[in-house]
Amino acid sequence: MATYFVGDLQGCYDELQLLLERVDFNPTQDKLYLVGDLVARGDKSLECLRFVKSLGNAAQTVLGNHDLHLIATALDIKKVKPRDRVDAIFNAPDFDEQIHWLRHQPLLVHSEELNFLMSHAGISPDWDLKTAKSCAAEVEQILQHGDFHYLIENMYSEQPDRWSPDLQGLARHRYIINAFTRMRFCYLDHRFDFACKSPLKDAPAELTPWFNLDNPLYKQIPIVFGHWASLVDEPTPKGIYALDTGCVWNNRMTMLRWEDKQFFTQSAVKNYSDF
């Protein structure tokens, strides 16, 4: 039995299958964890959704920002982004089933047995483990069982950009969603910056990656995340695993076998910018 993590798919189905073949993935014995953004700019988003869903308990994903945007478009809250290739999802006979399944995926996965935390973008520098788990559960409860339409309709905001336990209502839920699905750089006072998406060497001096801020949790439990393709080949602190290596940007897809921390990579098999 082996445990695998894989970076953002973004509709890059062929590369995922090549990686699974390479490691001889067996869904009756092995487990696949995905860091979110199953869909978007690649040409096989529907295949990615169907495949991960078909694995049942052999796979677990978390919600990424592109996954949430797909749900928003399915609810007629947002329009499909011009670069997203998701028409096949909207035309599929199992469209409602796929969106329902996606909406019921978590923002955070914590395994005590395997000793890891996984989310799409990371863990807020102001949260301990208890806070991270309770915040994720708050929003998951609404997405799965509450007024999810109202939440998704009102989640698009960059404020508040700093955590406070006194945050309530939509402000609180926006921060939680942004922390788990959009966070990259922060100011030293832990405020989020959503404008900068550049490689670390090109970032303004006042900004630092969230994982370089002082949070004891970052050293207590290994954290697996995706979302940040420009981190490719950048060193990260011990126990911080950045798995988005920009396959949809014509780079590569990365898989991590947890038991021995061995990485496997698959170069993009097509030029996605040509579509």
From Swiss-Prot:
Keywords annotated in UniProt: Hydrolase
GO molecular-function term, one example from the UniProt record: bis(5'-nucleosyl)-tetraphosphatase (symmetrical) activity
Record family assignment: Belongs to the Ap4A hydrolase family.
UniProt cross-references to InterPro entries, sorted A to Z: ApaH, Calcineurin-like_PHP_ApaH, Metallo-depent_PP-like
Function: Hydrolyzes diadenosine 5',5'''-P1,P4-tetraphosphate to yield ADP.
Keyword Hydrolase in record: yes
Pfam families documented for this protein: Metallophos (PF00149)
CDD domains in the record: MPP_ApaH
Organism annotation: Haemophilus influenzae (strain PittEE)
Transmembrane domains' residue ranges: none
Name of this chain's protein: Bis(5'-nucleosyl)-tetraphosphatase, symmetrical
Superkingdom classification of source: Bacteria
Gene: apaH
Reaction catalyzed: P(1),P(4)-bis(5'-adenosyl) tetraphosphate + H2O = 2 ADP + 2 H(+)
Enzyme Commission designation: 3.6.1.41
